[in-house]
Regions:
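N-terminal leader/linker segments that precede catalytic domains of diphosphate-processing enzymes
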Residues: 1-298
């Protein structure tokens, strides 16, 4: 079984679920879109050692209406109810996405007083202050809103596109209700992983990620696999953003079954409701199987 999964004993009460946001930061290459991924430190209690997209739990401050007054682009995101029924919570998820992306990758979706994306590659007082603030945020001691206000920066969520919605299965010890977003990475911002929670970071195409996974060089978990599979269908960042702007985003709550083999059933699988997987026998399925330590489609 994958070493990054952490299941509770059979029959245990499901743990509480926390809202979370994750961002697939994208850039164009001749070989198609690349996404920035980080390798979570193996000592982390959740998905330790796995290659994931930058993200994390929503904080109370993310949902503060006063904070939202200083943010641009909520109207450009579209119907906030697609993200969450509570508008304040939907905005909080978008704010968490921006904050966590900055903490874990150094990519900042914010504009200066002139309306340009912040230039973090230019050495100077601004980049120095932001990098220091990022380090404080990563250590859970900083204030993201105050960091932005100090230099007159304005968070801009207009480029975020709601991409996927996953809830951690009930069998896992830690559970999150996670919204995944796409965003084009601004130029003049070199992504770098956070050394507090991750041990490496890289730009990678979906094809290369799957190749490294099959070679057992990296660990991937099912939501990441599904997002990479979908991202691989787009030829460019613009295609990905346009193709997801208004697309329906179903909520996916997988069911994990542990027996002679580990099976994950997704909504739409013929055995999802019963929770008792049978051999496909020619039927179309929507599931993953764990074989020899790797996830496979049947």
């Amino acid at each position: 079984m994958s070493s990054v999964l952490d299941f509770a004993p059979q029959g245990s009460a499901p743990p509480p679920v926390r809202d979370a946001a994750t961002v697939l930061a994208l850039r164009d290459t001749p070989g198609g879109p690349e996404v920035f991924m980080v390798r979570r430190d193996s000592r982390m209690g959740f998905l330790g050692g796995a290659h994931v997209f930058p993200g994390g739990a929503v904080d109370a401050k993310d949902c503060d209406g006063a904070l939202h007054e200083g943010v641009s682009g909520f109207e450009a995101v579209g119907d906030l109810a697609r993200i969450h029924a509570d508008p304040a919570r939907a905005k909080g998820l978008l704010m968490a996405a921006v904050r966590e992306l900055f903490e874990e990758s150094g990519i900042l979706l914010a504009r200066d007083a002139g309306g340009a994306w912040v230039d973090l590659d230019q050495e100077g007082p601004l980049s120095a202050r932001l990098n220091a603030g990022r380090a404080e945020l990563s250590a859970r001691g900083g204030d993201f809103a105050a960091l932005m206000a100090a230099d007159g920066l304005r968070v801009d969520v207009a480029g975020l596109r709601f991409f996927a919605h996953w809830i951690t299965p009930e069998r896992e010890k830690k559970r999150f209700d996670t919204r995944f977003f796409l965003a084009r990475a601004p130029e003049r911002q070199s992504a770098r992983h956070c050394e507090v929670e991750s041990s490496a970071g890289e730009w990678i195409t979906p094809g290369r990620a799957f190749g490294r996974y099959r070679a057992r060089e990296i660990e991937l978990v099912p939501p990441t696999i599904a997002c990479l599979e979908r991202l691989a269908t787009f030829a460019s960042v613009e295609d990905a953003l346009a193709g997801t702007a208004l697309a329906a985003v179903p909520c996916i709550l997988p069911k994990i079954l542990i027996g002679d083999e580990v099976v994950i059933l997704y909504p739409g699988d013929p055995d999802y409701e019963s929770g008792e997987p049978r051999p496909p026998a020619g039927r179309p399925t929507n599931r993953l199987l764990m074989r020899d330590g790797l996830w496979h489609r049947p």
